[in-house]
Design a protein with these regions (language model features):
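N-terminal mitochondrial targeting presequence
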Residues: 1-40
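N-terminal ligand-binding/catalytic initiation module
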Residues: 32-304, 576, 603, 608-623
């Protein structure tokens, strides 16, 4: 009888799961992969539809659609499949690559960007189909490192507007001008003020290129619907003399606003976008350090927002640091024993320090003693050298990591000790670069790291773009030795160590986390993005690699797996939002239904809500 009852219970559970799967399929609505199989209502026809990248299919329009949308005679008669269209496009792109393969890399990369951008301008579905299929090859073109070149040259490259521009000249008008954007629903905004683009400094209005590139990855990696993303530039002027004196510069040619005037512009923008789209998520990108933390603290408990430079970079670094512990053959719980020298005390560096300290403290008991013990594991060096309590006018954000004078003296160090001296005396397990100073990890610094007490020291040259990386993998492996872990922010190729072994060059890029953080927040309906959700994302990424991969020195997965990685990270974020009672649900999946999902069902829920680039059937309806 008990066996029979068990069978009945199992059958009931199976029925419940099947019903739930049916529920997910029925309720995922237009944001699911079913979207492309349901008709889409459009309010334009003829040339207007061909000039709209959201709906244009080019030669893939069927004859019935051509008749329905007044397109007959406006296109060549041969109807091509999307695969045939991509084949034609890739032929042109590969021909360019063949012609330019022996030329300088920067012009070649910009030429690829131009070709991809032209496709983006005329046919978004095909653009994202190409990007997803070739993500490992083209992510470095639409995002780092090429996006840095794009931003530097944006005024000359500009052909067609993408996104919105809010400026100091628009004060008092933002609440109305936000309705100029045609999309009724926006799920994701990436906003920058152009003040600190990658490691390139103040690029003013040209910084919008980074917001566009980030959102390309939200679509390609996270499956956010491209019709529901919005890149934004807040132009408050620039302090870049070259741009101020350039007659072709597209932005405001005035000194950058500061203080209360600056805050007033950002406040007005935030109020405007959240008034029109109350559930939008806003990612702050490449704001200078002096404002990055202040704006994060100002808005994070009121709006659904996060700062990728502070929180995203920190999460990716934490995942890599935990992976480095695993690569040493130790459990992740040993992370609090790692001695870490950090080069760079800007927004990214401090963000990583805060996150690493919290992670260590949580492993040690999450009390005051644990936080103090965690603090003692970090030695922070900036442009003036080692930061100690003897430093005058220490930034408030860096203050918690200033070494006590006696601690420094016991280590044979002092206020302002050089990076070489600190590495020599501390003998760290990890050398972490977030300085935006290319080549900072010189041969002398790397030689000093050979004295590390670690069985397998780790070098993180995390600054972007490539020219700002603190060192190359070739430098690291050739100077320190084969038995190291190497990671960088921009892509580098693996190193042939000449003994049948490969020195793996891990790319610790923020794109492993920010798409999943955004998607998980969206699908959970979380009221805010908590530290716990960010921690869950980082730990998910750290655990993604297998033991065999980690032992080989691979601590970050290949970019080719980015859709699967993002699904896992988003599911972890959803789960954490549920556990923290922050989740309010998404569309028909209300908070109560969300709480009923188990781990695998959450992953399925995430997967079903990732947009895929397929042409929908278009049906005209008069507006």
């Amino acid at each position: 009888m008990s066996v029979f009852c068990n069978q009945i219970r199992a059958s009931s559970a199976l029925v419940r799961r099947l019903k739930h799967a049916l529920f997910l399929t029925q309720t995922a609505r237009s944001f699911t992969t079913m979207e492309g199989h349901r008709p889409t209502i459009v309010h334009k026809r003829s040339l207007d539809i061909l000039h709209d990248p959201w709906f244009n299919k080019g030669t893939a329009f069927s004859m019935t659609e051509r008749d329905r949308l007044d397109l007959r005679g406006l296109l060549p008669p041969n109807i091509m499949s999307s695969d045939q269209q991509i084949e034609r496009f890739m032929f042109d792109l590969k021909r360019l690559e063949e012609q330019a393969k022996d030329g300088p890399s920067d012009p070649n990369a910009l030429a690829k960007w131009r070709i991809l951008n032209r496709l983006h301008d005329r046919n978004e579905t095909m653009y994202y189909k190409v990007l997803i299929a070739h993500i490992e090859e083209y992510a470095p073109i639409v995002y780092t490192p090429t996006v840095g070149l794009v931003c530097q040259n944006y005024s000359g490259l500009f052909r067609r507007p993408r996104g919105m521009y809010f400026s100091a000249a628009d004060r008092g008008e933002m609440m109305s001008m936000v309705y100029n954007w045609p999309a009724e629903q926006v799920d994701m905004i990436v906003v920058t003020d152009g003040s600190r683009i990658l490691g390139l400094g103040d690029l003013g209005v040209q910084g919008i290129g980074i917001a566009i590139g980030k959102l390309d990855l939200y679509v390609a990696a996270a499956g956010i619907n491209p019709q529901r993303v919005l890149p934004v530039m807040i132009d408050v002027g620039t302090n870049n003399d070259k741009l101020l004196n350039d007659p072709l510069y597209l932005g405001l040619q005035q000194d950058r606003l500061d203080g209360d005037e600056y805050i007033a512009v950002i406040d007005e923008f935030m109020e405007a976008v959240f008034t029109r789209w109350p559930h939008v998520i806003v990612q702050f990108e490449d704001f200078q350090s002096k404002w990055a933390f202040k704006l994060l603290q100002r808005y994070r408990n009121t709006y659904r927002m996060f700062n990728d430079d502070v929180q995203g970079t920190a999460g990716v670094a934490i995942a890599g640091l935990l992976g480095a512990v695993r690569a040493q053959g130790r459990p992740m719980i040993d992370f609090p024993k790692q001695k870490i020298v950090v080069a760079g005390a800007g927004s990214a560096g401090i963000g990583v320090l805060n996150a690493a300290r919290k992670t260590m403290a949580r492993m040690l008991g999450n009390n005051e003693i644990a936080f103090e013990s965690a603090r003692s594991q970090f030695w922070v060096v900036d442009a003036k050298g080692l930061i100690t309590e003897d430093r005058d006018n220490i930034d408030a954000e860096a203050q918690p990591f200033a070494r006590k004078v006696k601690e420094a003296n016991r280590q044979g160090l002092r206020e302002g000790s050089s990076l070489i001296e600190v590495v020599q005396q501390v003998k760290p397990d990890v050398l972490l670069g977030l300085s935006a100073v290319g080549g900072l990890f010189s041969k002398e610094v790397l030689e000093a790291l050979k004295g590390s007490t670690s069985t397998r020291p780790a070098i993180f040259a995390m600054s972007n773009p490539t020219t700002n990386a603190e060192c190359t993998p070739e430098d690291a492996f050739s100077v320190v030795g084969d038995n190291i872990i190497f990671a960088s922010g921009s892509p580098f190729t693996d190193v042939d160590l000449g003994n049948g072994h490969i020195g793996h060059s891990n790319q610790g890029n923020n794109m492993y986390l920010f798409p999943g953080i955004g998607l998980g927040t969206l699908l959970s309906g979380s009221r805010m993005i908590s530290d716990g959700m960010l921690q869950a994302a980082a730990e998910c990424l750290a655990a993604y690699m297998t033991e065999d991969e980690v032992v080989e020195g691979i601590i970050y997965p290949p970019i080719s797996r980015i859709r699967d990685i993002t699904k896992e990270v988003a599911a972890a974020v959803v789960q954490e939002a549920i556990e923290e009672d922050l989740a309010e649900g998404y569309r028909e999946m209300d908070a109560r239904e969300l709480r009923r999902l188990d781990e695998e069902e959450i992953k399925e829920y995430v997967k079903n809500n990732m947009w895929t680039p397929e042409y929908p059937t278009l049906v005209y309806k008069k507006a």
